[in-house]
Amino acid sequence: MKLMKIITTPDKRLREKSEKVAKIDDEILDVIENMRKLSLDWEAKHPYELSAAMAAPQMGVLKRIIIIRDDMEDKKNAHFTAFINPEVTKTEGKTVTDFEGCLSVPHIYGKVPRPFKVRVKAKTEDGKEVRIKATGELARTLLHEIDHLNGVLFIDHIRDKKDAFYKMDSKGELLPVEDYEKEIKNNDKLWGEE
């Protein structure tokens, strides 16, 4: 297995729509294993953060694959479940605003509004079709990762909301960005060429 790397903004591949996976073969299984390894490698370098999930486009692989950590509260639980060709079939419930971060958007966090409930259908890596009913943090994480498959980043949902952006300090505390115009709105490293 050749280890890939996590790509970050403004890499244009993060803005492209991913292709459906036609067949779950060794190449796809290798991509999934790379995603798991990279997620844990990233986490090991970020002591205050937990790698909850990842999408294949974050490695520059434009395939509709995501992985979600089985327990997003426990760093010791390093198991991720892969979902292939995930599709949102329904969102419901009130919209809830909460913090999100992203391996591909370094050092920036945001308060993003998302539906509280979501239904998703997908295939597991062994080819079984699954239907997921998720609420809260799992719903948020599924929506965030499926956005990646459509070339959408969490920052796109809050681009014009000055008070929605945060940075993490050296102690792991999230603090509002000080200069929205410079750090967010006019930051070419976030948005790239438009």
Where are these regions (language model features)?
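Positively charged
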Residues: 1-194
